[in-house]
A protein has these predicted regions:
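Short S/T/G/P-rich N-terminal loop/turn motif that feeds into the first structured element of a domain
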Residues: 1-28, 32-34, 39-43, 55, ...
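Short hydrophobic/aromatic beta-strand micro-patches
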Residues: 5, 48-50
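Short, well-ordered coil/turn elements that cap or connect secondary structure elements
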Residues: 28, 64-67
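Short, surface-exposed beta-strand-loop junctions and turns on beta-sheet-rich folds
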Residues: 52-54, 65
Length: 80
């Protein structure tokens, strides 16, 4: 999951457009963006993705819209 802490002027339309831009280039980097959450008031955005590593996630954001995450948290899925 990557976290953008403060995107100035964040709107639902803007985050949707940025997510769409990610989807258009994600395959080039072996990434699959799953979903995102945002809070317009604070400017925070959380992006859930499946990727081989953090560098691949950063590359997608860099090439699609330039809004690099402030944090990338690498996690493994638990078994139920």
């Amino acid at each position: 999951m990557d976290i953008h802490h403060k995107i100035e002027g964040l709107t639902a339309n803007a985050v949707s457009a940025a997510h769409q831009a990610d989807l258009e280039v994600q395959a080039r980097f072996g990434v699959r963006f799953v979903r995102y959450w945002y809070d317009e008031k604070s400017g925070k955005v959380f992006c859930l993705s499946e990727a081989p590593n953090r560098e691949a996630v950063e590359a997608v954001h860099r090439h699609s819209h330039g809004l690099l995450a402030d944090e990338v948290v690498e996690v493994a899925e638990g078994v139920q």
